[in-house]
Amino acid sequence: MALLALLSGTVAAETTDSNQEQPKPKRVQTWGDLLDPDLPGVLTPKGSFVLDTSFSYTQNSSNSVSIVGYTVLPSLIVGLIRASDIDRTTLTLGLTGRYGITNRLEVEARIPWVYRTDSIFEREASSGTPTDTLRTVNGSDIGDIEAAFKYQINMKEAPYWIGSLRFKSTTGKSPYDVPVNDLNDFEELPTGSGFPSIEPGLTMIMPIDPAVIYANLSYIWNIKDDVEVDVTSGDQEFQASTIDLGDTISFSAGMGFSVNPKFSFSIGLSHKTILKSKIDGSTPSDAKLLQLDSLSFGANYAISPKTTLNIGATAGLTADAPDFQLSVRIPYTLK
C-alpha cells in the first residue's frame, strides 16, 4: 500500500502530461541504467527520511470443543468436555523510519508496541450442572523489532522490480516465556513470536494509466531455537526442546487507481501458506498446514506534499485468517 501511495501522484501526473506531449521513442535500457544510483525511482529518494506512524486493530474469533481427561471406551468419556468461544483483539502502534541511501536503495526499521486481549467464554458440558465462565487474559509490551533493505532493480522501463530483505528480532515476549496455568492456558499473552526470522521478497509494480498493478512474493524463514517447555504443572520441571516454527509463503496482488493527484484507492488479494512446525526434528501428529486468504481495500490521501493519510481494511476469507483488520498510517517526509 505504501508503494501505491508513492506512485499515485506520479501516475496522475503522467496522465495529465500525456494529453499535452507527443509520445517519444523508447530508448533501450542498458546495464549502466540498471546500476546508476542517481536515477529517480519509486522508493524513498536519496537523502530523504520518512517517519511513518501506524495503528492497527485486529479482531478474530474462534469456537472449539476440548476434552480435559481421556477416553476409556469410544462411548465412555472420563474427564470434562469444555466448549469455548474466544474473541481475540490486538492493537498495534508502530513507528517506522525509512531512509533513502540512494534513489534505488532504501533502509527501514520498525518498532511496534502490542496490546492483546482475549475474552474466553467456556462451558463445561459434561459436569452435573453446566457451568459458564468468562475469563479475560491481557498482554502488552514491545513487539518484535524489524529491519529491512529494499532495492529497485530497474529504473526506466516498467514493470518496476523491487527486491527486499527483512529481518525480525525477538524483542517481544515469547509464548514460551509467559506463565501458563494447569490447563496450559496463557495467564499473560505474548507480544512476539519467540523466534527470529529472515524474509526475502520480490515486488512488481506496473503503471497503466490511470491504474497501477502490483504483485508481491515473499518467504519467511523462521530460525529454529531451543526453548524450555513446562512438562509438569506441579513440581515445575522443564524440558528443553528444539522448535522449528513453520515457515510462511506469501503472495499478494492487486490494483491501485489514481482518482486525482491527491487521492487514490487500491484493492487486493493476499494468500499465505504456513507450513507445519517441527519439534526436535519431527512433525507432531496434530500439526496443521494453515491457509490464510484475505481481501484488502485501501485509500490514500495526500494531506500535503510531505504528509499522506493511508487507511486500509482487510477481511479474512478462510477460517485461519483474522476476521477483520483496520489500519491507519501517516507517513511524513522530514527531508
Predicted regions mapped to residue ranges:
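Extracellular loop and loop/strand-boundary signature of outer-membrane beta-barrel proteins
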Residues: 37-38, 79-83, 130-137, 185-190, ...
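Residues on the lipid-exposed face of transmembrane beta-strands in outer-membrane beta-barrel proteins
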Residues: 39, 51, 55, 95-101, ...
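Residues that define the transmembrane beta-barrel architecture of outer-membrane proteins
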Residues: 89-93, 131, 135-145, 159, ...
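Repeated loop/turn-to-beta-strand initiation elements of outer-membrane beta-barrel proteins
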Residues: 105-107, 157-161, 210-213, 262-265, ...
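Hydrophobic alpha-helical segments and helix pairs
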Residues: 140-196
